């Protein structure tokens, strides 16, 4: 039976835009790098230890699941020696990921929009709840005690400080609330797992993000229905793209933000990963949000402007914010609804199902720069 739930309007705060900048280089010539090893390497931890001794690499993370490799602070003078090791596939300079915040007043409407082809009717209809599906939230953590989650938010992984993946920023709790909150969520029965890769200031690094993806890949059980949400992004990174691709190959459907630069999404990671569901943002009038990235790397759009969801400051607080960060969890939630009813669908099949079922031609204000952008708006019948 399809349930109907009235939407709650809350007029509050903040829009978030994500960007990436190079990690600062230390004055002694050392900087943070991601060292990706050949797939044939069986023991990346051993190679990392060997490189630490031979080249003075100060290892921060070791990757075993989503890719083989490690991150470390390394003297740039040692990079030539590292690259000469035939077990090294390539080396990337690490990048920081940060969140910029502005304010606005608005109310939530996203759930109302995705369950019908046209307009709004102040309700959200659904059959499935996402029960039995795991949703990994790769973000700032989750306030797992929030009333929106009803005990469905469980312990996860913390790449920032090895803690409990608690959210001291708010962004991750908001994203989780849109995926699976009891009031504001698409999939109201999904299990939510925090994967904390951004700190209390909303800052992190690609090396930490890869550590989170690596943990997700290792935690995911073969054949188990699962989705992952990445409402973050930054400059192009082959290592990040590879980690996401390998996690998808393991059976986890990834929804990733297109980005908030009003630019071609193909310039950014992980938005440019073809196997992922790359999501742009729309406004309440079905216009492309002015900040949303665009282009052929997008798969579809979803509501992203003025979205109300859970917040981290108490077990009942909410916040209203904007961005492709807010559009992406709508897609992750619908993917979870689909997987409840069809748990053996592969990530490629889920992506195809969501694209083919989307409302066609509904998004306006794409503009000439958006040539090649698929005009598809998220729709759920699940």
Positions of predicted regions on the chain:
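Structural recognition of the beta-strand scaffold that forms the well-ordered cores
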Residues: 33-36, 71, 90-92, 134-138, ...
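Solvent-exposed loop/turn segments at secondary-structure junctions
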Residues: 39-42, 66-67, 77-79, 95-99, ...
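Inhibitory N-terminal propeptides of secreted protease zymogens
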Residues: 22-104, 226, 345-347
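Protease zymogen maturation seam
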Residues: 26, 49-62, 84-134, 147-148, ...
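C-terminal subdomain of the subtilisin-like protease fold in secreted/lumenal serine endopeptidases
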Residues: 60-61, 194, 212-232, 237-243, ...
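Secretory targeting and sorting signals
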Residues: 1-26
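Active-site-adjacent substrate-recognition loops and nearby beta-strands
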Residues: 103-106, 121, 125-128, 162, ...
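Subtilisin-like serine protease catalytic core
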Residues: 26-29, 123-155, 163-208, 221-227, ...
